[in-house]
């Protein structure tokens, strides 16, 4: 893969559609017009209608053509965009012509070039990928903020502060007779202030990452209490087998759902009971594992046994506030009805009649509002960011007042490097490959 190549790709999903967009980027991007039989000059930043031809001068399609000369384009290179009809035949014929001169882009290569040409940093690039992959409104809001530079500005501010502190310290090291010794006190004070800012940022309860991936909700209970029925209802499709025979569900099933604009991963689990069946026991172990790691637990109990539930025994290790209690199969319940049993609030739910389901969904949304970022929050969104920021915080926390100035300077260089890895001010090819390979081909 050479940066000198001119590349092209379909930037819209493959398939029949009203419009398809083909993007060409590189030094020779404008040659795509000559290649496709367009003889008139194409004006920059003006949408023009052109007929595109194959090498035999047979018309392929009429296209809206846009030309963005570099560096004032997304990639920082000359870019041509062809908006054509979303016909598989049109796309295939245009690809056949373009491929005689240009190379098909690798996944994420347009965004990679934008990064390498200084148009975006790595946090913005990752925000763009998250924006493309967002499925709920809350995910979209977070991804848009990141792609707009919220994280970039914060992390660059920290990195710049470290560079300034390091500059003052190195001036003291190189010219001790000309620089006041008070500079050392100032260095340590500023380092501690920056460390406090880093720690506050890291102490976010992983809310940004949870929003990016979805809040995990485990549906738990004994066999035949309606777990799979509720799971299918929340998933809006029949994913789990529903049977009157206990032990039907023996594995973990997952469904990504949007509840009130927030992303959830709803998990169906095996009924928890004593069993001699090896496969069922494995399913029960997985159910207990989900119970231990889920962000939210929905614990189902049959409405018919409301007088003798054994709530406290049902949750191994005690209740940690993550559990929503449900009396299932409550066909005669009233909408929104709840009941206090053994000191716990229970939602009465009947999937069969749909009673109580809205109240349960509202309870899940309330948990999401508490567990996800608030509007305007600037939070860590990936483990890659968190790892480098934790490393920077650890290095800074190891600095002591008694350390020689030269050692402090080395620690500050390491911390600066770690924060630079988040934004891409410091990077290696392996980091870039790992980030951009997750992008779609046309982005």
From Swiss-Prot:
Q: Which SUPFAM superfamilies match?
A: P-loop containing nucleoside triphosphate hydrolases (SSF52540), TrmE connector domain (SSF116878)
What binding details are noted for the cofactor? Binds 1 potassium ion per subunit.
Question: Could you describe the subunit structure of this protein?
Answer: Homodimer. Heterotetramer of two MnmE and two MnmG subunits.
Q: What is its EC number?
A: 3.6.-.-
The name of this protein is tRNA modification GTPase MnmE
- PROSITE patterns referenced in this protein's UniProt entry, alphabetically: G_TRME
Principal subcellular localization: cytoplasm
Q: Which cofactor does it need?
A: K(+)
Q: Which gene encodes it?
A: mnmE
Q: Name one Pfam family in it.
A: MnmE_helical
Q: Tell me a GO cellular component.
A: cytoplasm
Per the UniProt record, the lineage of the source organism begins with: Bacteria, Pseudomonadati, Pseudomonadota, Alphaproteobacteria, Rickettsiales
Instruction: Please tell me where Mg(2+) binds in this chain.
Output: 228, 249
Q: What does this protein do?
A: Exhibits a very high intrinsic GTPase hydrolysis rate. Involved in the addition of a carboxymethylaminomethyl (cmnm) group at the wobble position (U34) of certain tRNAs, forming tRNA-cmnm(5)s(2)U34.
Q: Which residues form a coiled coil?
A: none
Which BP terms in the Gene Ontology apply to this protein? tRNA methylation; tRNA wobble uridine modification
């Amino acid at each position: 893969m050479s940066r000198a190549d001119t590349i092209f790709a379909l930037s819209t999903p493959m398939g029949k559609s009203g419009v398809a967009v083909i993007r060409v980027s590189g030094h020779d991007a404008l040659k795509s017009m000559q290649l496709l039989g367009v003889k008139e000059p194409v004006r920059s930043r003006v949408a023009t209608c052109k007929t595109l031809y194959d090498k035999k001068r047979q018309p392929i399609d009429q296209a809206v053509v846009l030309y963005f000369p570099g560096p004032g384009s997304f990639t920082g290179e000359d870019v041509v965009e062809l908006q054509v009809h979303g016909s598989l035949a049109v796309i295939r014929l245009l690809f056949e012509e373009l491929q005689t001169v240009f190379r098909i882009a690798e996944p994420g290569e347009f965004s990679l070039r934008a990064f390498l040409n200084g148009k975006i940093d790595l946090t913005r690039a990752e925000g763009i990928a998250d924006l493309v992959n967002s499925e709920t409104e809350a995910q979209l809001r977070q991804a848009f903020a990141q792609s707009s530079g919220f994280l970039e500005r914060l992390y660059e501010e920290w990195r710049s502060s470290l560079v300034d502190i390091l500059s003052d310290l190195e001036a003291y090291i190189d010219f001790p007779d000309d620089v006041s010794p008070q500079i050392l006190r100032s260095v340590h004070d500023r380092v501690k202030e920056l460390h406090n800012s880093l720690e506050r940022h890291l102490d976010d309860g992983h809310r940004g990452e949870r929003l990016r991936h979805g809040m995990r909700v485990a549906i738990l209970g004994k066999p035949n209490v309606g777990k799979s029925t509720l799971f299918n209802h929340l998933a809006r499709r029949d994913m789990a087998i529903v049977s009157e025979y206990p032990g039907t569900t023996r594995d973990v099933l997952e469904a990504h759902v949007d509840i009130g604009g927030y992303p959830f991963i709803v998990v169906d689990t095996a009924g928890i009971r004593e069993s001699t069946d090896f496969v069922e026991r494995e399913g029960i172990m997985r159910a207990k594992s989900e119970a231990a790691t889920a962000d939210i637990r929905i614990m189902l109990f049959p409405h018919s046994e409301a007088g003798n539930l054994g709530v406290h025994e049902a949750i191994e290790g005690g209740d940690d506030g993550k559990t929503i209690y449900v009396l299932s199969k409550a066909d005669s319940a009233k909408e929104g009805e709840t009941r206090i049993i053994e000191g716990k609030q229970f939602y009465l739910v009947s999937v069969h009649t749909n009673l109580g389901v809205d109240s349960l969904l509202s309870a899940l949304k309330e948990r999401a509002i508490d567990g996800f970022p608030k509007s305007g929050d600037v939070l860590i969104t990936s483990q890659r960011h968190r790892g480098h920021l934790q490393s920077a915080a650890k290095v800074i926390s190891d600095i002591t007042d008694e350390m020689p100035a030269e050692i402090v300077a080395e620690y500050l260089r390491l911390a600066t490097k770690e924060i630079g890895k988040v934004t891409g001010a410091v990077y290696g090819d392996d980091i870039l490959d790992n980030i951009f390979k997750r992008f779609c081909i046309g982005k």
